[in-house]
Amino acid sequence: MKDETAAGVHWSFWVIGAVALVWNVMGVINFFMQMNPDMLAAYRESERAIIEDRPAWATGAFAIAVFGGAAGCLLLLLRKPVAYFIFVASLSGVMLTMTHTLGVGIDFGPGEVLGIILMPLVMAAFLIWYSKLAMRKGWIS
């Protein structure tokens, strides 16, 4: 059985790209939800405290993280190598956002640490690695 699609790209490239795009679009939706006061009211108190007291630089970093991640995924699926650099910018945004989140002094539970802090970092780092792999294999050029 042949593992490559008609475009000469392994089938997993499309699956990983699509799943990563969905993940990052969820981040974009979350960003817009946090900008809406009515939606923000539905968040838990600990989450609202982080969002409401967030400085402009952290909000900007969050925007770079989520919009960069979504744009990078679109570029990856379009097989453009610039996706790698967009993912690097996105990871930088994630790290700055996490710097603020960890600095607010809220005691996070294990689930919150995994969902709010570790998963975005892991996903952003993975996408950098994966886009570099895709370049090496000639899937994006």
Can you say where each PLM-predicted feature lies in the sequence?
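Topology signature of small-to-medium multi-pass alpha-helical membrane proteins
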Residues: 1-141
